[in-house]
Amino acid sequence: MSKKVVSTTTAPKALGPYSQAILNDNTLYISGQIGIDPETDEFAGATTAEQAHQIFDNIDNILHEAEFSRNDIVKAALFFDDIADFALVNDIYAQYFDTTSVEEFPARSAVQVAALPKNAKLEIEITAMK
């Protein structure tokens, strides 16, 4: 078993005592990402849509740093501050994976939580495997 910290300046730095991602053998665990632009350390926008797009950019950048791709994602966990945004995020999520078959999407869970760090609208955690 080999465990390696994955870190990139093209995604926001951790807000607490955790790594952006951990690569353990062939599995990449990406910590929950919120819609912070790594260049400004501020939210990419106030809306769920703006934050969702930034989250997917951040995830892409971490995947790239670990030499993984979107096709390697096997599980996504979505945390909403308001589950009413579920359909909106589904549309953005579907564009991100760019697939026509629901069977090709990663496994996923989506829940509403009481609050997210920095009052984010959405947080997404990813597991990817090669």
From Swiss-Prot:
It comes from the Bacteria. NCBIfam families: Rid family detoxifying hydrolase. The lineage of its organism: Bacteria, Bacillati, Bacillota, Bacilli, Lactobacillales. Belongs to the RutC family. Pfam families: Ribonuc_L-PSP. One of its GO terms (molecular function) is deaminase activity. One of its GO terms (cellular component) is cytosol. This is RutC family protein in leuC 5'region.
